[in-house]
Amino acid sequence: MFCLQSSQALQVLENSLRKHLPESLKVYGTVFHINQGNPFKLKTLVDKWPDFNTVVIRPQEEDMTDDLDHYNNTYLVYSKDPKHCQEFLGSSEVINWKQHLQIQSSQSDLGKVIESLGATNLGKVKHKQCFLYMVCQTAKKLAPSLMDAKNLVVSRNKLTPLDQQLFKFASLDVTHAALVNSLWHFGGNEKSQKFIERCIFTFPSFCIMGPEGTPVSWTLMDHTGELRMGGTLPKYRRQSLIYHVASQQIQTLEKLGFPMYAHVDKANFTVQRMVGLLGQILLPCTWNQWNCVPL
């Protein structure tokens, strides 16, 4: 096992992961931001170097003091050979299987290995799979071969124009974390709110302020750079607000040069239609999250 710390090695890793897009997307996006200053202070592990097979991005051990906090105890994994990475992922130096944790990857093929390791460590594993999309501007720059017409999601639905007398673009404040948490599908608890607070504090966030001067629609970035946690207050839905705030987010992050990608639940047809309005690329791989709980 090797822990990559030098800027040179991490840049080599980023360049290598780029060649394996889109399957490496979740890890690539994380390494990109590690190379931009590592704002979440993440740790990069590889099984060997420089000819690595498997990469794991995780928090530092000193930042994983709460055994029950799977929002913080998150591992991002990419492997060139998903069926033969069990020994590396099974190492206690790589993944602490005694904690409540989650593993995220753009490779569903990792499932059998993760489920096997969960069973070996007397734990329960729950898998969530979603559609994975890449913003067109990112695909053009990083993986132009994905710009095939059959991958481009386009919606012909008409948009409701933004009433700029009532609504104003703004950024979220950490004090808005409770509001975001209340509508986040994966949240709704104290630990998720703490995670959201850190995301708002660390990365650019975007919202639309309503007539009351409070956020009515918003979207954030998580610790991997993924566009996440979008939401709209129920009374303001069906006004295309989430489209307008997501469009603002994409325009701003494009200027910063950030890779942009997001997942959508397979049953969330409303957000899928919005993705169509934004003209994003549906990737051939999927967004995967395995929640592991020791019994």
From Swiss-Prot:
TM ranges: none
**Gene Ontology CC entries for this record:** centrosome; microtubule; mitochondrion
InterPro entries in UniProt: Acyl_CoA_acyltransferase, Glycine_N-acyltransferase, Glycine_N-acyltransferase_C, Glycine_N-acyltransferase_N
**One annotated GO molecular function:** glycine N-acyltransferase activity
Q: Which domain of life is it from?
A: Eukaryota
- Location in the cell: Cytoplasm, Cytoskeleton, Microtubule organizing center, Centrosome
Q: Which UniProt keywords apply?
A: Acetylation, Acyltransferase, Cytoplasm, Cytoskeleton, Microtubule, Transferase
Q: What is its EC number?
A: 2.3.1.13
Q: How does it assemble?
A: Binds to microtubules.
The protein's name in its UniProt record: Glycine N-acyltransferase-like protein Keg1
Which family does the UniProt entry place this protein in?
Belongs to the glycine N-acyltransferase family.
Write down the top EC class of this protein: transferase
Q: What role is this protein assigned?
A: Acyltransferase which transfers the acyl group to the N-terminus of glycine. Can conjugate a multitude of substrates to form a variety of N-acylglycines.
Q: Which reactions does this protein catalyse?
A: an acyl-CoA + glycine = an N-acylglycine + CoA + H(+)
What positions are modified (N6-acetyllysine)? Answer: K41, K43, K48, K80, K83, K124, K128, K140, K150, K255
* Pfam families, A to Z: Gly_acyl_tr_C, Gly_acyl_tr_N
The organism's taxonomy opens as:
Eukaryota, Metazoa, Chordata, Craniata, Vertebrata
